[in-house]
Regions:
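Membrane topogenic/interface segments and analogous intrinsically disordered interaction regions
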Residues: 5-291
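Low-complexity, intrinsically disordered Ser/Thr/Pro- and acidic-rich segments
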Residues: 1-3
Length: 291
């Protein structure tokens, strides 16, 4: 059963690609590109994507002060907008635990090359974020011929939607999850005898990984859309495991947030809404496919 399914899926995916690029150079007499020609085309998509990321990284590298002082290190500052708003909310509802990051985490660099390599790493991450719409467009233009005309119609705007969702995820991770994570991890103590002195690479790794992970997580509706199109995922399956998804979201939110219900809700609700939107998209795709 498994080999048959794989062969069927492989054939249904690759056949349109092989037929959809017949105008390329060096095509065979039947008007279809060979496997090696497809690899060559994919190679150029990857090269152009890498060039775009490098250009974005160079731009980010030149704006070091803005990138670090006003973006990367900002969530650790009491004046960061999220920290200020949560402190105001803490006063309004009389929940002091909501007021976070009032004592900034002390950051140190323990290697001679630490700050320079950190600068390069952050520049590359920023380059990836800046170039994401173009990178997604490059890979989308490679896989788009695998879709039938009707499927292309339904997939219009995929690049724009994926870019907006990724940006929304980055914003959510940076403004919501990152400050809460810094507060939790930076103040956590196994013993009063241990003092936290956080390495700058550890801090930046946490902030960037949280932001990127949120950006990727927000791509869930796009992933569900295409999995539903090829019949791998159904809305019934997602509804069946809805409770499991809720438990996972609540557990993750409880770990990274302060021990109060407001922070838990603040992190959980957007992720649960994202899951419900994905179910709606999967159901819509199934209805369109059966129509």
């Amino acid at each position: 059963l498994k080999p048959k399914f794989y062969l069927s899926l492989h054939a249904s995916t690759m056949a349109p690609i092989m037929a959809g690029k017949s105008k390329a150079k060096n095509s065979n007499p039947d008007g279809e590109m060979t496997f090696l020609q497809h690899l060559e085309e994919l190679r150029w998509h990857i090269i152009r994507s890498l060039v775009a990321i490098v250009i974005g990284a160079i731009v980010a590298f030149m704006f070091k002060d803005i990138i670090f002082d006003h973006i990367i290190l900002a969530p650790n500052n009491p004046d960061f907008i999220t920290n200020r708003l949560l402190c105001r909310l803490a006063d309004m509802v009389n929940v002091p635990l909501l007021c976070i990051n009032q004592n900034p985490v002390e950051l140190i660099s323990i290697k001679l090359t630490g700050q320079f390599t950190t600068h390069i790493t952050i520049s590359l991450v920023a380059g990836l974020i800046l170039a994401f719409p173009y990178v997604f467009r490059e890979f989308w233009s490679f896989f788009r011929p695998a879709l039938y005309e009707k499927e292309r119609k339904y997939a219009r705007g995929a690049v724009t939607m994926a870019s907006l969702l990724f940006l929304a995820g980055i914003i959510f991770g940076y403004f919501i999850i990152a400050p809460l994570s810094i507060n939790f991890l930076g103040t956590y103590r196994v013993s009063d005898l241990v003092t936290n002195q956080i390495n700058i690479t550890s801090y930046i790794g946490s902030v960037t990984s949280v932001a990127l992970a949120s950006g990727i997580t927000f791509e869930l509706p796009i992933v569900v859309f295409f999995l539903a199109r090829i019949g791998v995922l159904t809305p019934e399956f997602m509804r069946k495991y809805r409770r499991h998804a809720i438990v996972v979201v609540l557990v993750v939110a409880a770990v990274i947030t302060p021990p109060d219900v407001f922070s838990l809700i603040l992190v959980s609700i957007p992720l649960l809404i994202l899951y419900e939107v994905s179910i709606f998209l999967a159901a819509r795709v199934v209805r369109q496919r059966e129509a």
